[in-house]
Amino acid sequence: MKCNRLENQVCVRTTGQYRLCCVSSEPDNVENIMTHDISKWTGSNARTNAIKLLTNNIWPDACTRCKVDEEAGIESTRQKSSHYGPGITHLDLRFGNACNLSCRMCWPGSSSSLVQEHQEFLMNDIISPWGESSFVVHNWYDDETALELASIPTLKEVYLTGGEPMMVKGLLKFIQLLDKNVSLRFNTNGTILNPTLLEEIKKFKNVNMCFSIDGVGKINDYIRWGSKWEDVYRNFKICKDAGFDVSIGPTVQILNELYMPELRQWASDEGVDIFENILSSPDYYSIKNAPWRNNNKRVHDDFIKYTNILDNKRNCFIADYLPEVANAYGIS
């Protein structure tokens, strides 16, 4: 068994920590891009041991996601990566957790805005949806590291997400260092589009902009709090007009499941692909626990509790944005 993604990609978390891949579930790795160059990671025990196990047809513990998918007959992340290689051809980078939005289903590890909100909850003795752990804002970008990454001779594709990649300090410098034959892929919330950066991105032959859009209009505004639909749609159109390969990647959850037909139709009308990501955590947002699907009182109570906490903090109320969902939970 072979995983080209594991062998031919370098994946870095928002903290700078190397990771086997974007869906792996290994414990914290000691190797961090701020203290270990790429060769230290590619030669690390965590990575080499995982490769050896797969070669012997043994699933590493960190690869449970792909194991479960393949046993269920679902194409796994491993199987989708056959075109990777030879050498390090792909980068999956999260330069930090800087983000201007406070998405309902997200967590402070991926959003600096949620770090602030979480801290405000704790300081005011209010129950936080993210527990009592402490979180910090990360930004591991520096010019030396950017040059090392951009100089990989076999590099074919760079995937940038976050946080919000358009907020990364130094992103323009990094983009300027890359060979223009490298494919660029962004996962963006669509609220920010720097004109200077846009002109630099236009120099690349292949650019994919995947907009994280969870609904049309005020549905998206509620779920991805801090966004304004008119801004997102304007930037969406700019990227389409620039000739980029534009798609949308909604996170399918209880908050938007009832409105997905509308979003699918919108994507079809706009002529873009839609890649639906099914949320698994937190469980009170998972569609398997929707009140129109089961009667799990504990999980439903959690949904109501955390919805009310965030609604009161943000002074926005679910009944005004997602009335069908509010009615299903008896929220008025």
Model-derived regions: residue spans:
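A structural signal for well-ordered alpha-helical scaffolds and beta->alpha junctions
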Residues: T42-T48, P60, I88, D92, ...
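Core AdoMet radical
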Residues: I88-A98, G109-Y141, P153-V168, K180-P195, ...
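Conserved C-terminal portion of the radical SAM core fold
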Residues: R185, F204-C210, E230-S332
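Short, basic/hydrophobic alpha-helical segments
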Residues: D143-A150, I175-Q176, F236-D241
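N-terminal pre-core extensions flanking Radical SAM catalytic domains
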Residues: M1-V136, S151-I152, Y306-S332
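Residue-level recognition of alpha-helix termini/interfacial anchor residues
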Residues: T77, G170, L258-Y259
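A short acidic, amphipathic alpha-helical/loop segment
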Residues: E148, G170-L177, T196-E200, Y222, ...
